[in-house]
Design a protein with these regions (language model features):
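Bacterial N-terminal signal peptides
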Residues: 4-15
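Exported/periplasmic ABC-transporter solute-binding proteins
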Residues: 19-58, 62-66, 74-87, 91, ...
Length: 247
């Protein structure tokens, strides 16, 4: 953010906010890198303290079901909508932050397979010794894609699903998975992984990640200010650097 733009954003977002608060956030890992870049700027500008738990979709749902208390939730848009329906997120509070496609990675130094077309990807999957995928939205999509490709039965014994909260990049880097799939934002800069690219255009899928105010939030106004800060035009570069499209 430029000094001028940041100064304007601070004035518009924090004008009239007299007290600093602690904002408790439960967040998906897909937006983590961009979020970590932006939050310290927000804390410095606002005086608020942000405490964040980053985890996978399944674990986030378990935490909410167990009654853990937060002020702001960041998950996929469909998950936010579900939590609005079940009363855990305030209706009308959903704000879309950014969207991410699904990327492909292999262990650093390994030959990069051909994923340029759907047919090439299919051949690569059939030839791979092991295939990593997640429990999150990207994993759900990939399981459906394997079925639509007609290869689900042939590759089932090679599939390696990471536990919730564990990056697919970790099992690629360790060699447990020869090839792996996860959100571009989670995979493209993972240590020990060479990023191959996104899925072919005709089967490309995007997931929108959104925020929502938790019902009964103690610091709802401060949480809303955080959302305004990380969705301001000047914050877009932080998401773009991680392969995400803001908004």
């Amino acid at each position: 953010m430029t000094t001028t733009t940041l100064g304007t954003a601070i004035f518009l977002i924090f004008a009239g906010m007299a007290h600093a608060n602690e904002i408790r956030v439960l967040s998906t890992q897909a937006t983590e890198e961009a979020y970590r870049e932006l939050v310290p700027q927000f804390e410095k500008a606002s005086g608020h303290k942000v405490t964040t738990v980053f985890t996978g979709t399944l674990d986030a749902n378990k935490r909410l079901a167990a009654g853990e208390t937060y002020d702001l939730l960041i998950m996929s848009a469909p998950s936010i909508d579900e939590h609005i329906k079940d009363g855990k997120v305030v209706p009308g509070s959903r704000v879309d932050l950014a969207r991410s496609g699904i990327g492909v990675g292999v262990k650093a130094g390994a030959p990069k397979p051909d994923i340029g077309t759907t047919d090439a990807l299919k051949k690569t999957l059939l030839a791979a010794k092991s295939i990593g995928y997640s429990t999150g939205p990207s994993g759900v999509y990939m399981v459906g894609l394997f079925q639509r490709m007609g290869i689900a039965d042939e590759i089932r014994h090679k599939l390696k699903q990471t536990p919730t909260g564990v990056f697919v990049g970790s099992i690629i880097a360790s060699g447990e998975a020869e090839i792996g799939f996860q959100q571009v934002s989670e995979l493209s800069h993972f240590a020990g992984v060479d990023y191959v690219g996104a899925l072919p255009a005709d089967i490309r899928q995007f997931t929108t990640f959104s925020s929502g105010i938790i019902a009964g939030a103690k610091t709802a106004d401060a949480a809303k200010a955080l959302v305004k800060f990380i969705t301001a035009p000047a914050a877009a570069a932080a998401f773009k650097k991680r392969g995400m499209e803001p908004g």
